[in-house]
Amino acid sequence: PRVNMCRLAAYLGPEIPLRSFLLDFPHSLYQQSWDPKELTEARLNADGYGVAWRQRDGRMGAYAQPMAIWNDVNLPALADALTSTSWLGNVRSATPGQPVHAINTQPFAVDRVAMTHNGYLSGLAQGGRGRILSNLSDVVQSQLNGTTDSEYLFALLRQARLDGAPDLATALAAALRIATQCTAGQAALLNVCVSDGEQLVFSRHAVERPCPSLYLNRSPAG
């Protein structure tokens, strides 16, 4: 079956407005939504978009719309009004059969952690979803709102943190390990970025498929 994929971007550094992160960078996420490069399993990312950012109180905020990014009439005003030192962004190409809805639109954020995922987990409908749920506490299960593989991966990450993972990298590694075990080693693309507003942690991983590209750029402060 055809499985579509999202595009993601992340930023950590001096405070910048949302416009700089989402719209103004060369080949920005906005441009990638309709003019992608190196996109292997979709043509457009028009099924929603979202951003997450570190708020003044240290918690991660999120904004998501289940529409193409270029159709959001609120974006120009938000792009100038919101500023942060940490951003995550995602433009979505929904897997066929997955509802296009705000609750299924990344990034996902709970309290002081946010996550965005480019890729997919196969096998959820073949028992993988139930096996993932069996690894989640009642508290984490109660916070599930949508139906996507990405949100279930985020739930596993939060569970790993509740179970005592000492840092984000350890929690992400645990989430990826359990997710691939629960889906019995079926095909998966697992480019993931996690943020607590003070650090970014990435994975570039795949099962039975080539990894999607993932680029890192470091610039001097300021």
Report the location of each language-model feature.
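Extreme N-terminus nucleophile/cap motif
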Residues: 2-67
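Short, basic and Ser/Thr-rich N-terminal targeting/leader segments
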Residues: 2-4, 45-49, 82-84, 89, ...
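Conserved catalytic micro-motifs used in adenylation/nucleotidyl-transfer and phosphoryl/amide-
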Residues: 6, 51, 105-121, 177-222
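Short helix/loop capping segments that flank catalytic or ligand/cofactor-binding pockets
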Residues: 19-20, 61-62, 97-99, 124-126, ...
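Short acidic (Asp/Glu) patches
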Residues: 33-36, 66-78, 89-111, 135-138
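Structured interaction and signal-relay segments at domain junctions
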Residues: 48-85, 89-91, 204-208
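A short, polar/proline- and glycine-enriched secondary-structure boundary/capping micro-motif
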Residues: 72-75, 134, 211-218
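Short histidine
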Residues: 122-196
